[in-house]
């Protein structure tokens, strides 16, 4: 998932 990306 792009959860890490959404963290930005």
From Swiss-Prot:
Native source organism of the sequence: Namaquaphasma ookiepense
Similarity comment text for this entry: Belongs to the FARP (FMRF amide related peptide) family.
Entry keyword Transferase: no
Keyword Translocase found: no
Parts forming coiled coils: none
Function: FMRFamides and FMRFamide-like peptides are neuropeptides.
GO CC terms, sorted: extracellular region
Protein name, UniProt field: Extended FMRFamide-5
Primary location: secreted
Domain of life: Eukaryota
Residues recorded with modification Leucine amide: 8
Localization of this protein: Secreted
TM annotation in the entry: none
UniProt KW keywords: Amidation, Neuropeptide, Secreted
GO biological process: neuropeptide signaling pathway
